[in-house]
């Protein structure tokens, strides 16, 4: 049975999943009980780990623990931000086909290459499984959030990641818009409100200004930086500590030691969090590098000084969004903080001062608000009839201007940034040479006057134009942006009716359909491998638990008296051999563990039966022990039932 549609906040550092059920949004906890899950994937000699398990082993396995996929998705390898990030990543990123970045790892002893979409799809698969475990049903439909300032390539790539994860991506929505739903869902009445969403997460930053009235959420303007967040503050703290270590230890530089750097980063991130509630934090690392310990104390003031430039840069998009919306700061009724990095006191102070002392709204959980809004939108799109969400309408905007190149490399804009979407605009163009039989349509996004300074999304040819003097042919170009913010372009020769159409699926950070199909197959294969590994671990635990239970019970004096020392000692010897075998065969197959369990059961179960028949069942009045499984004797084939203990 298929479950309801879910909302996933696919974050740079953490992800969150939610569902709308029984007129309420439920944030779904993972198997560790945490309501957010690290966006981490790790590859070891034996298995693939996702989420908490991946992050927890990061210091031991830095080269094969992948995070920050969101900072790679939809980008080119030679992108300035990718090159900058590579200095901080312990894993290897190389230049792949079409200039797409490839992530290289060693998995089960083999070199493997992944695209960012595949890593993100693994995180999405984990979030899907968390939801399925909670709902007890399979999940297919999803709304995934992206930063409002993500460009076309990044949106397409995120949609592809959902497809690879076996999900039907109903809609891609902007993170601040989703957060606005979380803020405004229960605030019916009270007239029109101008709300500014300040969303500073682990890796991205967005500002959106919305007008909210009676369930209508209309985005007026959006601005941001897809490469600013908590990770950047961590980097500055790490760089400070590396310099400090050099100063204290005669110039010893730990920068090239990935494991030391990763341990330091983990402690710096922890210190950053502590500094949100305390005025100082201590970093203590035993044997950080060449046996040298590193201990230091960071004050909140020092941290703020290190990050001052980055903190202040968050106000630039705020000013830009206000200017684009035509509002001044006094017209903003509420400033809503979203994203874990808004817990930093200095960020809160900067915003408060910018808005002339207005206290920011802290009524929504900054880690969960985006997933909350995504779940509401998922419920609406899947036809949920709840009265609470029936009247809700989202009107979002295109974050960047879209246009095409005309003579001289000029950017001719068809859709201006902050235009409400979905939208459709057309314009007539012509040829600039006599008897020109074809035109090259080049589609760009960006705010600069010349196309060379903007981002090329794609290009296509319209051929078969009837030969005519320059300026005579009429070519109608139509730009159509769908609700996901993804662009379709059509060019038509008005005289012949001949047209060409393209959804922007160029190789600028985009996967081909063949690549997506291959990745879907591989994702299925990895899922099967994970399942196989899980069954192996389960059967190993089953064998170990059975052996230890039997060992404890058979070691009791009363049992030896009832059954005879020889029989008991023989069984205990079999159990000891089995436990030694498990110790030496940690990577055995599921069937091998099962066979070994049957062998041990074959020796022990007759003794169990004999005990029950003699009326001296464990747990009875003359017995202090107890077999797992309670009062009835276990069936010969399966042995006692043991409860799994993690």
Swiss-Prot record:
<keyword id="KW-0547">Nucleotide-binding</keyword>
<dbReference type="InterPro" id="IPR043129">
    <property type="entry name" value="ATPase_NBD"/>
</dbReference>
<dbReference type="GO" id="GO:0005524">
    <property type="term" value="F:ATP binding"/>
</dbReference>
<keyword id="KW-0067">ATP-binding</keyword>
<comment type="similarity">
    <text>Belongs to the heat shock protein 70 family.</text>
</comment>
<keyword id="KW-0346">Stress response</keyword>
<dbReference type="InterPro" id="IPR013126">
    <property type="entry name" value="Hsp_70_fam"/>
</dbReference>
<feature type="region of interest" description="Disordered">
    <location>
        <begin position="613"/>
        <end position="646"/>
    </location>
</feature>
<dbReference type="InterPro" id="IPR029048">
    <property type="entry name" value="HSP70_C_sf"/>
</dbReference>
<dbReference type="GO" id="GO:0140662">
    <property type="term" value="F:ATP-dependent protein folding chaperone"/>
</dbReference>
<protein>
    <recommendedName>
        <fullName>Heat shock 70 kDa protein</fullName>
    </recommendedName>
</protein>
<dbReference type="InterPro" id="IPR029047">
    <property type="entry name" value="HSP70_peptide-bd_sf"/>
</dbReference>
<dbReference type="InterPro" id="IPR018181">
    <property type="entry name" value="Heat_shock_70_CS"/>
</dbReference>
<dbReference type="Pfam" id="PF00012">
    <property type="entry name" value="HSP70"/>
</dbReference>
